[in-house]
Amino acid sequence: MPPLDWLRRLWLLYHAGKGSFPLRMGLSPRDWQALRRRLGEVETPLDGETLTRRRLMAELNATREEERQQLGAWLAGWMQQDAGPMAQIIAEVSLAFNHLWQDLGLASRAELRLLMSDCFPQLVVMNEHNMRWKKFFYRQRCLLQQGEVICRSPSCDECWERSACFE
């Protein structure tokens, strides 16, 4: 699927209250409006509960701004040119608490792999062992760092779905 179609899919999931997106998918007001125009979409108001959840995620993500910026910049280096602002969106949602496909509101991990194949094809090739995407992102970033080798990455040991991944 072309990256623009993936952006539209995420736009629709965001407005349907799916996933763990922050407000405006973490984009600045200017970038949000640019995405809306690019997609040809009309801004539809979020229901009260969804708006509250989106605001809460934005507040939580704000406490990890430096991490989000670093992850977004790293992802942007691997992103297809016509996929912007997908790197920012993925970086924002990567700070949420579930598997990335769930936090994006996608139907399955397989659907996330399709998104990644279309928007970040080189990362899919690099992830030859099909590691969970959040863990893969942080592991790759850690390998590029010099000095301290301690990496902040999602903790599989604390995940309630651990048995589904490691049986």
Swiss-Prot record:
The organism's place on the tree of life at top rank: Bacteria
Pfam families: NifQ
Keywords noted in UniProt: Molybdenum, Nitrogen fixation
GO BP, one annotated term: nitrogen fixation
One Gene Ontology molecular-function label: molybdenum ion binding
Keyword Endoplasmic reticulum: no
Transmembrane segment boundaries: none
Keyword set includes Mitochondrion: no
Family membership noted in the UniProt record: Belongs to the NifQ family.
Function: Probably involved in molybdenum processing.
Protein name as annotated: Protein NifQ
Source organism of this protein record: Klebsiella pneumoniae
Gene: nifQ
